[in-house]
A protein has these predicted regions:
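Bacterial N-terminal signal peptides that target proteins for export
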Residues: 1-13
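Structured, non-membrane catalytic/scaffold regions adjacent to prosthetic-group chemistry
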Residues: 28-167, 289
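Periplasmic c-type cytochrome electron-transfer domains
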Residues: 128-133, 137-179, 225, 232, ...
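Electrostatic cytochrome c docking/interface patches
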Residues: 170-195
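The canonical Cys-X-X-Cys-His
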Residues: 192-207, 233, 251-252, 267-271
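Gly/Gly-Pro-rich "capping" loops immediately C-terminal to redox-active cysteine motifs
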Residues: 205-238, 253
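Axial heme c-ligation environment in periplasmic c-type cytochrome domains
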Residues: 213-219, 239-288
Length: 289
């Protein structure tokens, strides 16, 4: 190859590398990845803070800090402007520690007494560590404001988030989550499936279905109903430290306002039912038994 050809060839090669490398490689700080329908947008923290629609908000009920706090934030609906979200889809938020929560489309766009915001931690104004933890809730934290914000489950206040993506509803995305279709319409396991997705699916998988990695699968290789008594499992879910304690323990306790006794019973009904439906999930398709 002649010297005159090397220059243009090298330039082309470097350009191709730059196009295929994720934006986060070149970013100087934390980034938030937003993906939907095959398109990916990577937002740099400083770029987000420079947006004209950034506002200052104050929470009255803050799940991470347990006390009112003021943040600079952008409305989640504004961040998702131009993104097509089907009526039955969810916005999946993934955190650094493997925590994953599914935000229903109707909740994201509620705007009637409930508004979701992405709070942004500025480099020159760092947030304090979360109580009992050594890190803050940043750099990105989803918080809710409005008269009805207290009705949003604590599991839908994810902090330290790294990505948001539009996905099918969990049961459609992972059919192996579903209860037996022949179950009676009023069988408690049916409602239990919904509660499980809202409360447990953030950390656990079921039949290897799910995106979370913070906790173990709850059906493979064994379902907890197969080695816990009913009373023991209820105690573990309500307050894990009342059953066992170890230094790396991560599962939180659940107050009655976050998980009612009725909801706890529905989760157990679902787990009991699923213990006879062991399979390995195939995303978007049939399960493998």
């Amino acid at each position: 190859m002649t010297a005159t050809m090397i220059g243009p060839a090298l330039t082309l090669a470097l350009s191709l590398v730059a196009l295929t490398m994720p934006t986060s490689v070149w970013a100087t700080g934390p980034t938030l990845t937003v993906s939907a329908d095959g398109s990916v947008h990577i937002f740099d923290r400083d770029a987000l803070l420079a947006r004209t629609d950034v506002v200052e908000i104050t929470t009255s009920r803050d799940v991470a800090y347990r006390t009112p706090r003021t943040y600079r934030a952008v409305a989640l609906a504004k961040l998702l402007e131009g993104v097509a979200i089907p009526p039955d889809a969810v916005v999946e938020a993934v955190a650094q520690d493997g925590f994953v929560t599914q935000l229903p489309r109707d909740l994201v766009y509620a705007n009637d007494g409930i508004v979701a915001y992405v709070a942004i931690e500025a480099a020159d104004r760092p947030w304090p560590p979360i109580p009992a933890k050594d890190k803050s809730a940043g750099a990105f934290y989803i918080v809710w404001l409005g008269d009805q914000a207290s009705s949003v489950p604590t599991m839908m206040w994810p902090y330290q988030i790294v990505s948001l993506s539009v996905q099918d509803a969990p049961a459609k995305r992972w059919p192996s989550l579903a209860v037996d279709p022949m179950l009676p319409a009023l069988h408690p396991a049916r409602d239990g499936q919904t509660v499980f997705v809202n409360k447990c699916f953030t950390c656990h998988t079921m039949n290897q279905a799910g995106s979370a990695s913070a906790g173990p699968d709850l059906n493979l290789p064994m379902n907890p109903t197969e080695y816990f008594t009913d009373a023991g499992l209820r105690a573990l879910i309500r307050d894990p430290r009342s059953v066992r304690v170890w230094p790396e323990q991560r599962m939180p306790s659940f107050a009655e306002e976050d998980l009612s006794d009725e909801e706890l019973g529905l989760i157990l009904a679902y787990l009991n039912h699923m213990s006879d439906r062991k399979s390995r999930a195939t995303e978007g398709g049939s399960s493998k038994r």
